[in-house]
């Protein structure tokens, strides 16, 4: 009888989170809080192909739904996606993407819904701020405000733990004979070269001069970064000639002695798995706005990354390892 009662009273809850990798990492605490506030409900997550299999590992999600994110004018795709979502009869939606696209989904699925049914930064906007002002607040504080305004108790949103994404990498570590290592992420998207610090090889020289072979110096290039990795004087870690998947990448980061990264997805992973490290920020944004600084993971913020010396970065590393 109790089981029947629970089944009858179980609701379906939808979370929307499309990407990018840094965004996915940051949302881990919010997803955990949503789940813990809905212990008797089933949590579904709508995401994109790069994160579909990854989210199947998340212990706080019951089922993952794929959104191919085809153009909005593809009415046939849109029709079938909306039909798919409607069949779950979701009682509440948490929009953690907060994009124009997900706002468009709301206009189809729940056009008149308030924050009790559709939780987003728009429906939970503070009375004294417009959206532009609200978006200047750090991303984790925005999530926290959104969930609090939606009636949730939040104990994880401000301190996400991405550890759930990790996997066994003993075979990779054995293949490359690595134990203690310093992990570098000198890469960035081709259209975001403003995020790229140019002095990694000089930093590597400083590390080798101080520590010799105490630490291996490695990189973990993504699919489009394998060629670029050849320009860095570090061991590039691959899995049978291919880039590591997100779970393998997470474990490599989590097991490292120290991480040095440009402002990229792997830097956000490092921040939210508790590893020691530093990320390098130019004037493109602030470390505060993207919520990347943690107890062990810090940012160096400068106006021009070209003028940030390898010595300054090495100083952060050596003081942390000593």
Which residue ranges define each predicted feature?
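Conserved nucleotide-diphosphate donor binding/catalytic pocket of glycan-assembly enzymes
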Residues: 65-162, 181-186, 190, 284-287, ...
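Donor-binding and catalytic core of enzymes assembling or modifying cell-surface/extracellular glycoconjugates
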Residues: 199-278, 282-285
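Short amphipathic alpha-helix
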Residues: 24-36, 50-53, 203
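Nucleotide-sugar donor-binding patch of glycosyltransferase catalytic domains
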Residues: 120-121, 239, 268-322
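Conserved nucleotide-sugar phosphate-binding/catalytic loop shared by glycosyltransferases and other
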Residues: 44-74, 234-238
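Nucleotide-activated donor-dependent transferases that construct or modify glycoconjugates
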Residues: 10-21, 184
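Active-site donor-nucleotide binding/catalytic segment of nucleotide-sugar enzymes
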Residues: 161-227
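A short, glycine/small-residue-rich beta-strand->loop->alpha-helix junction that serves as a flexible
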Residues: 16-27, 54, 189-198
């Amino acid at each position: 009888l109790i089981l029947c009662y629970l089944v009858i009273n179980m609701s379906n809850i939808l979370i929307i989170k499309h990407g990018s990798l840094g965004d996915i990492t940051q949302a881990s605490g919010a997803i955990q809080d949503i789940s813990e506030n809905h212990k008797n409900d089933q949590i579904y997550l709508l995401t994109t192909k790069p994160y579909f299999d990854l989210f199947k590992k998340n212990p706080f999600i019951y089922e993952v739904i794929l959104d191919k994110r085809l153009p909005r004018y593809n009415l046939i795709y849109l029709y079938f996606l909306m039909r798919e979502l409607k069949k779950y009869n979701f009682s509440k939606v948490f929009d953690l993407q907060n994009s124009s696209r997900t706002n468009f989904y709301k206009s189809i699925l729940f056009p008149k819904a308030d924050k009790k049914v559709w939780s987003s930064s728009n429906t939970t906007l503070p009375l004294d701020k417009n959206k532009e002002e609200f978006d200047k607040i750090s991303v984790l504080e925005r999530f926290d405000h959104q969930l609090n305004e939606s009636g949730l108790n939040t104990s994880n949103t401000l301190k996400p733990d991405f550890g759930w994404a990790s996997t066994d990498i003993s075979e990779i570590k054995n293949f490359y004979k690595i134990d203690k290592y310093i992990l570098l992420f000198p890469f960035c998207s081709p259209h975001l070269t403003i995020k790229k610090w140019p002095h990694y090889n000089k930093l590597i020289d400083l590390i080798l001069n101080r520590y010799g072979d105490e630490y291996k110096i490695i990189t973990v290039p993504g699919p489009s970064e394998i060629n670029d990795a050849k320009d860095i004087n570090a061991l590039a870690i691959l899995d049978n000639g291919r880039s590591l998947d997100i779970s393998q990448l997470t474990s490599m980061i989590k097991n490292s002695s120290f991480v040095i990264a440009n402002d990229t997805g792997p830097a956000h992973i490092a921040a939210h798995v508790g590893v020691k490290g530093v990320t390098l920020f130019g004037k493109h944004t602030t470390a505060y706005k993207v919520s990347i600084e943690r107890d062990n993971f810090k940012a160096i913020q400068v106006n021009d990354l070209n003028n940030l010396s390898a010595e300054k970065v090495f100083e952060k590393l050596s003081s942390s390892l000593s």
